[in-house]
Structure formats: C-alpha cells, structure tokens
Swiss-Prot record:
Gene: rplU
Oligomeric form and interacting partners: Part of the 50S ribosomal subunit. Contacts protein L20.
Stated name of the protein: Large ribosomal subunit protein bL21
Superkingdom of the organism of origin: Bacteria
Any one GO MF annotation of this record: structural constituent of ribosome
Family matches, as SUPFAM superfamilies: L21p-like
Transmembrane segments: none
Length: 103
C-alpha cells in the first residue's frame, strides 16, 4: 500500500500522494514556486497518523504548475409574473499543484 496524505487548502480536503497533480482553490504563488500544505491525516502503509503533535512534524510540499479557471457556471435568477430575469456566469480560479514530497 502506498503512502498518502489528506491536506487542507481553500476550505477543502484533498487526498494526495507523491507525484499527484491536483487542482486546488487559487493560491497566491507564482508558477514554479514551492508551497507547503497543512496536513490533516497521513497514511504510510498500515500506519495512520492523525494526532496533532505528530502531524506538526509532517510536511507536504508541492510545486505550482499553473493558474487556470474551472468550468463556467451559469446562474439564472427569475421572478414569476414580474418580468425579472438576471443572468450571470462565474469561473472559479484554480491552481494546479504537483505534489513533490510527504516528509
């Protein structure tokens, strides 16, 4: 069984292993920069680490590959019998990360 970690960023949690490429909420880092992510859980074979004092020693590092946008979401507000229509679109800004290490 390979080792992996659960990291927290942008109000969400992601399961990552070394070499994984994940899209996370936008981070304030330039492409090519190295970032460190807070860890919620580490699994290394049969060993599961979830205690806060043990997780403080663990670091998940990654490299920012690029900044991109997610799919377009269309919002349409409508009120009956008044002629009120409001259309809006949104594309969430994302950061593509490559996990380089779990130590």
């Amino acid at each position: 069984m390979a080792s992996y970690a659960i990291v927290k960023t942008g109000g969400k949690q992601y399961k990552v292993a070394v070499g994984d490429v994940v899209k996370v909420e936008k981070l304030d880092s330039e492409p090519g920069a190295s970032v460190s992510l807070p860890v919620a859980l580490v699994v290394d074979g049969a060993n599961v680490t979830s205690k806060a004092e043990d997780l403080a020693k663990v670091a998940v590092t990654g490299e920012v590959l690029e900044h991109t946008k997610g799919p377009k979401i269309r919002i349409h507000k409508f009120k009956n019998k008044t002629g009120y229509h409001k259309r809006q679109g949104h594309r969430q800004q994302l950061t593509v990360l490559k996990v380089t290490g779990i130590k």
